[in-house]
Amino acid sequence: MIKANWTSTSAFNLELALDESRDWIERVINQKFPSDFQSSLRDGIFLCKLINQIQPNSVPKYNQSPSTDFAKRENIQLFIKSAKHSMGLRDTQLFESQDLFESIRIRNIAITLYWLGRAARASQTYKGPQLDLLKFQGMNCSACKKAITNNDYLTTMTQQFHTSCAVCCSCSCKLDPKKKFYQESNNFWCENCMLGATNLGGSNNSSGGKNKSNNNNNNKCSGCFGSLEKGYVPDENDKEKKYCTSCICDLCHDPLIGNFQVKDGKKVCDSCSCKSCGKSLEDGYYEEGISKYCEPCAKDRNKPKQVMDKDGHDHHHHNHNKPTTTTTTTNSNSPLAKKKSDSCKMCDKPVDNKTKKYGDDRDKYCTPHEKDGTCGKCNGELVGSAISVMDKNFHPQCFKCDSCNKNLNQNDQIKKSPTTGNPLCGPCSSNNNKSSKNCHDCKKPISGSSVEALDRPYHPNCLKCYSCSKNLKEDFTEVDNEPFCNPCASQLNQYTSGNQKQPKQGGSPFITSGWLDSDRCVVCVKPLNGEVAKIFDSFYHKGCFKCTDKSCNAPLLTGYFPHDKKPYCQKCSIKIQQSTTTDHCAKCSKPIIEGSILKVAGKVYHKSCYDNEKHTSSSSSSSSVNCFKCKSQITGTQFVRLDQKDYCMKCSPSASSSTTVTHGERLNYGMTVDPRSGKRVFNTSK
């Protein structure tokens, strides 16, 4: 407990924050500002360049030479919109365009750059220069954690508060800026509530020799033994221990920014505390945007949650080639672990609709949480501590090399197995260990020279284009983790990007959105990303979209033929129809799967075969065939069969003579297939 006064000097130095912002932006975009910092930002160009460096293509198009005020404001709006949607910043963390363009409320610009810098630190992909958050110390209210956007605030030596947030914790009265108050951590007491308190401040008023001898120790930080002139925070359990604001957080090891807590001798920063209740997040947390919540608070919010490990605060400082220890929340004593048997043990979503194909603990979780709740090695449920590495979690006893079964340590250099995705130790993943490698293509051991592509070993003659099987001796292009020669990759991009001429009906089966997080590729059962082919209710990665016939397995880059809701190439489709049809031409004995059919004297013919054969004039037997369209009985000798359906001559669609097979274009059946819906539309024009 300390007796304190309000100060007239803000704990936040705006000039220092703006100087750090300018230096950070120049280091990120590798370009110096030509003039005054604020004036250089007015056209929005530097801001758009900044966010594109942090999150590539966040602002794909902006005016790089704006000549009008409207164009400049539009660039600023593009930056604000991208910071909100791409980086997860909230409206309260963003400045308005007039704040920058009219040079008002400059403090709000610093607030936005501060939160953008924090979001960049949390990004898993951004590896560039980082913003020094210490230069923004005291920017937010230490009580409500919200930004102070005006001059209506009160400050202490190390903290500042909205005037409305500076209230007595006992009587809830607003603290008078002209009077002294009493403070302990984030709690304040007015003088009236502290009247009559026993020995309050007695140690400060006493002049005993003992207190005098300990004066030097009382003025030093218990953590770094530095000076406490700029303020301190007392330990909640040991009032004699004091910690300065320069100490680092004991959980994330980042410098302490603004307010922090001390519990059980551990210093915890705001980022390692629950956004709602302030509780330490050392046992794990739930993340929502860039805010973090403890388990009870996250459950009360009833929003989609994802369990993160306790070190998730600064994963950007970690070496991602090394595993990290995490603590799961699937312990049976946890409130969230006591679920119904038909609900996911992590998010309460029903798992009834999920295919129970594993027969182990993975069936206890919904598809998005299978990896979070189960071991990547034994598929057993994770209880207590676990090791998180390569997008998987492992029991400590299961964290072994996938090849030699050697126990792995957290400091070991490991590599991801290209087949199972599990970790490999250094010797097993080394390129020098030739005898332990098999060619990824032919599966035979590699004893001589080898080449490596996409983290997989090949014989020199086995590295071929995934599409045309051309031997790849020079550069190649990766598409969905498969090698393609440059011509095939260019052709693939033409079909999927819309550069290829498309028919009027139908369209490409490749889509870039529209699936759920629980949807998986039906071939590799991996999460969907990038361009995906949708056939009826099934999804395929672009590299997995091949003919269903295993003996063929041809990539379906230029079209497909559906059978039983599965895609086939043209050759395999014809084979299927030939094997299923019951009608064979009486002359050539070949199956009749398309074109015009003649039925004479109980026999069926291809029209071309019947026309080329001389027949005696005889009356034909009555036909028992019904038209598929009008349902009437076909009385003549000639009818048309398309896609194993019979039509009278009046209702028959035109047979197609085209043999081109592209997505949605006319097939040799005389119809158009919409790959997204599977709807078939007969072509009426030749």
Curated annotation (Swiss-Prot):
Subunit-structure text: Interacts with limF and rab21.
Its job: Involved in the regulation of phagocytosis. May repress rab21.
Region (Disordered): 305-345
Annotated Gene Ontology cellular component terms: cell cortex; cortical cytoskeleton; cytosol; phagocytic cup; phagocytic vesicle
Induction field: Repressed by limF.
The protein's name: Calponin homology and LIM domain-containing protein
Biased composition (Low complexity): 322-333
Residue ranges with Basic and acidic residues bias: 305-314
Highest taxon of source: Eukaryota
Entry keywords, A to Z: LIM domain, Metal-binding, Phagocytosis, Repeat, Zinc
GO biological process: filopodium assembly; negative regulation of phagocytosis; phagocytosis
Domain Calponin-homology (CH): 15-120
InterPro entries the UniProt entry points to: CH_dom, CH_dom_sf, SM22_calponin, Znf_LIM
Source lineage: Eukaryota, Amoebozoa, Evosea, Eumycetozoa, Dictyostelia
Listed CDD domains: CH_LMO7-like, LIM
